[in-house]
Amino acid sequence: MIKGHGIDIEELVAIERAYLKNARFAKKVLTEAELSRFEELSGKRKIEFLAGRWAAKEAFSKAWGTGIGKLRFQDLEILNDRQGAPYFSRSPFTGKVWISLSHAAGLVTASVILEENDES
């Protein structure tokens, strides 16, 4: 059963401005493992990665029903599988977490669905 669905959309330029203004911005948003991957990237791809993680974590917090505030960015970790698909490797939700990210026209969108485990 679906517990929640959250969507977020961000402008890449807004995330880039925040990052350029304060280098600690990435450390606030990203876990150690995410930061390691982030530091391997360069240019536009680096900003897309950071914006994608930001949007996905915001979308999760909306699906969870708390928003960021009751939930910290560090409570959530998104890694990529062998095919490059993102997945939540850390979250407070014990069920299945579905995530979709898309980048286009200077925007990133994230959709997160929380599905409770069947207990029947």
Curated annotation (Swiss-Prot):
Q: Which GO terms describe its cellular component?
A: cytoplasm
- SUPFAM superfamilies per the record? 4'-phosphopantetheinyl transferase
Which GO molecular function annotation, any one, does this entry have?
magnesium ion binding
Swiss-Prot/TrEMBL keywords: Cytoplasm, Fatty acid biosynthesis, Fatty acid metabolism, Lipid biosynthesis, Lipid metabolism, Magnesium, Metal-binding, Transferase
Q: What class of enzyme is it?
A: transferase
What does it catalyze? apo-[ACP] + CoA = holo-[ACP] + adenosine 3',5'-bisphosphate + H(+)
Question: Which GO biological process categories is it annotated with?
Answer: fatty acid biosynthetic process
Under the heading InterPro entries, the entry gives:
4-PPantetheinyl_Trfase_dom, 4-PPantetheinyl_Trfase_dom_sf, ACPS, Ppantetheine-prot_Trfase_dom
This protein's cofactor list reads: Mg(2+)
Which residues are Mg(2+)-binding? D8, E58
Q: Where does it mainly reside? A: cytoplasm
What family is reported? Belongs to the P-Pant transferase superfamily. AcpS family.
Function description = Transfers the 4'-phosphopantetheine moiety from coenzyme A to a Ser of acyl-carrier-protein.
Q: What is this protein called?
A: Holo-[acyl-carrier-protein] synthase
Q: Which organism is it from?
A: Streptococcus sanguinis (strain SK36)
Gene coding for it:
acpS
